[in-house]
């Protein structure tokens, strides 16, 4: 039988969606626990509500179909995007309706940013600080104003339109989440098409994303910011679309615009160097990176990503194949190499998520450090409270993501790992070497902990004995960070040598000039000495202990000498049953639980170090004749080399603002400081307590209720060991972060 060309074409067409996959049922959604036969029966004990929360998003426990799990995750992503767009819309609406953005634009150095006014109900109006420009409101430290300035937003009307756009996008995302689960749900092979996904994400999301941002900066943000920097009033600047459609207007600011696209197609790209620059350093007017450098950077990235997005083999017979790349990746000591990893990454979303969380967490920490060393937005560097907030925010986000990576890595090991499919590949070989890896890492932690704290204890002892000449310090026994200083110097010398076209250093943290804006220091060389060497070894210690706990949780997720059948017990279990003492707190969940405490330790030391170092050695004022006055007078080098110095000259000294905030516009921080301490202390009640104590207490209370014929229909139960730890951990972190937030902001707002 001859096949027609139409039939042949239809056979080649791949159908990647299933129509009307799941009916839309409000009645089903209204039933709590509809996803579980057990939970749908309703509560018999108070444990039901805990299980409801634990399992609502644990799609693995609701179905064994990988396709169904994939669809639920995909749909949930649209819901997440809807919330993000709604949040962004709300931020812009606040900027449009409640803020002093227009006033701030006219004088961003002396006017503080505010986008919320508290109503006077019972005296709360005390929180409305005088932020300058005839405006009273809560001082905000989010960095939105600086970002809006960099985008070229000059009026509240533009913020309104952006807010409406965000609202519309939020609605579209909600619709898309419903549509792609109920009406046109992708099939499993669509989710597993790694090459197509890589091409679209690289060329589409990253490539076109960078290109559109670069285009916006060139055509809208650059001309508007150039006029603002020159002192032109925001009201007198043409509307954004005029720069877009009027080439003559652009040519007045950037002459190369008059030449059109001829230099581009002629390969004479240097003609565009008036708006695509490679200056390096910071704009002396705003203290931020040159926006023309940023536009150039994103244009270059877009080219790289668009090329990268054509790298993988899809419908045509050219390009890379992910499975082939992985299976060809073999070294002399790595057995089968990456064989089997392709199957893992296309069937286990926990494995995929683990890698993504680890990468995104690391990226967030990198962003935190770049935000102060290379401030990207105008007038960000001189807004010290915002700088401290952004650093702290990105460090916490990074810490949580990295721990999340370990959590999902362990879940993958328990639920998705198949030993038979991973014989002698890299993953199998790491698992077989786990005792060597963990014991060596443990030795490193002991070494770092003993030596790092030993330095401090030595210094505290010598200072107490009145022997400063025997201390580790820049003035006595020096421990100079010579490698860090060498790296700083390499970067300082790069312009004109290894970076021949750069006009200034990448960051003035490495050395060079003092950049000041309106008499406030934006950035200056950050000198590193003995104090930094010592605290960096505390960083190394806390980070290595966090990694030790998390890595042990992943490598011993399926089995250990103590519990050989751990994989059968699952990701989360309290102990290995009755009659096996000493097996509690050995599940992968418990490793994540312990790892979060050490993550909290790690990040706390980092943000304390940053806050004090910047106040001591960078932030401050400079007079016209060049005399510099730092906020804490350069006391970091001599005070931070003892534990007593950290307690007295940082924690106690800088807590004065939050402790004495009552009766001022910062009084909310005083209350948060107090309240967050209570939340933190409340956590200890769960962390230092046994379940049996509470069960006995509950039973005596239930007895009293029964005596009065007032017994509840839902039987009260004490929290399980795991639930108690989860509640304790949540309050410990919330209380600790809330306390730090209040301490930092009350201090930072007073010095900004």
Curated annotation (Swiss-Prot):
<feature type="transmembrane region" description="Helical; Name=II">
    <location>
        <begin position="159"/>
        <end position="182"/>
    </location>
</feature>
<keyword id="KW-1133">Transmembrane helix</keyword>
<feature type="transmembrane region" description="Helical; Name=VIII">
    <location>
        <begin position="533"/>
        <end position="551"/>
    </location>
</feature>
<feature type="transmembrane region" description="Helical; Name=VII">
    <location>
        <begin position="436"/>
        <end position="458"/>
    </location>
</feature>
<feature type="transmembrane region" description="Helical; Name=X">
    <location>
        <begin position="666"/>
        <end position="688"/>
    </location>
</feature>
<dbReference type="GO" id="GO:0009522">
    <property type="term" value="C:photosystem I"/>
</dbReference>
<keyword id="KW-0408">Iron</keyword>
<comment type="function">
    <text>PsaA and PsaB bind P700, the primary electron donor of photosystem I (PSI), as well as the electron acceptors A0, A1 and FX. PSI is a plastocyanin/cytochrome c6-ferredoxin oxidoreductase, converting photonic excitation into a charge separation, which transfers an electron from the donor P700 chlorophyll pair to the spectroscopically characterized acceptors A0, A1, FX, FA and FB in turn. Oxidized P700 is reduced on the lumenal side of the thylakoid membrane by plastocyanin or cytochrome c6.</text>
</comment>
<keyword id="KW-0472">Membrane</keyword>
<keyword id="KW-0560">Oxidoreductase</keyword>
<dbReference type="GO" id="GO:0015979">
    <property type="term" value="P:photosynthesis"/>
</dbReference>
<keyword id="KW-0812">Transmembrane</keyword>
<dbReference type="GO" id="GO:0009535">
    <property type="term" value="C:chloroplast thylakoid membrane"/>
</dbReference>
<keyword id="KW-0813">Transport</keyword>
<feature type="transmembrane region" description="Helical; Name=VI">
    <location>
        <begin position="388"/>
        <end position="414"/>
    </location>
</feature>
<keyword id="KW-0479">Metal-binding</keyword>
<keyword id="KW-0602">Photosynthesis</keyword>
<keyword id="KW-0150">Chloroplast</keyword>
<keyword id="KW-0411">Iron-sulfur</keyword>
<feature type="transmembrane region" description="Helical; Name=IV">
    <location>
        <begin position="294"/>
        <end position="312"/>
    </location>
</feature>
<feature type="binding site" description="axial binding residue">
    <location>
        <position position="685"/>
    </location>
    <ligand>
        <name>chlorophyll a</name>
    </ligand>
</feature>
<feature type="transmembrane region" description="Helical; Name=XI">
    <location>
        <begin position="726"/>
        <end position="746"/>
    </location>
</feature>
<feature type="binding site">
    <location>
        <position position="693"/>
    </location>
    <ligand>
        <name>chlorophyll a</name>
    </ligand>
</feature>
<keyword id="KW-0460">Magnesium</keyword>
<protein>
    <recommendedName>
        <fullName>Photosystem I P700 chlorophyll a apoprotein A1</fullName>
        <ecNumber>1.97.1.12</ecNumber>
    </recommendedName>
</protein>
<keyword id="KW-0157">Chromophore</keyword>
<keyword id="KW-0603">Photosystem I</keyword>
<feature type="binding site">
    <location>
        <position position="575"/>
    </location>
    <ligand>
        <name>[4Fe-4S] cluster</name>
    </ligand>
</feature>
<dbReference type="GO" id="GO:0016491">
    <property type="term" value="F:oxidoreductase activity"/>
</dbReference>
<keyword id="KW-0793">Thylakoid</keyword>
<keyword id="KW-0004">4Fe-4S</keyword>
<feature type="binding site" description="axial binding residue">
    <location>
        <position position="677"/>
    </location>
    <ligand>
        <name>chlorophyll a'</name>
    </ligand>
</feature>
<dbReference type="InterPro" id="IPR020586">
    <property type="entry name" value="PSI_PsaA/B_CS"/>
</dbReference>
<dbReference type="InterPro" id="IPR036408">
    <property type="entry name" value="PSI_PsaA/B_sf"/>
</dbReference>
<feature type="transmembrane region" description="Helical; Name=V">
    <location>
        <begin position="349"/>
        <end position="372"/>
    </location>
</feature>
<feature type="binding site">
    <location>
        <position position="694"/>
    </location>
    <ligand>
        <name>phylloquinone</name>
    </ligand>
</feature>
<keyword id="KW-0249">Electron transport</keyword>
<keyword id="KW-0148">Chlorophyll</keyword>
<dbReference type="InterPro" id="IPR001280">
    <property type="entry name" value="PSI_PsaA/B"/>
</dbReference>
<feature type="transmembrane region" description="Helical; Name=IX">
    <location>
        <begin position="591"/>
        <end position="612"/>
    </location>
</feature>
<feature type="binding site">
    <location>
        <position position="584"/>
    </location>
    <ligand>
        <name>[4Fe-4S] cluster</name>
    </ligand>
</feature>
<dbReference type="Pfam" id="PF00223">
    <property type="entry name" value="PsaA_PsaB"/>
</dbReference>
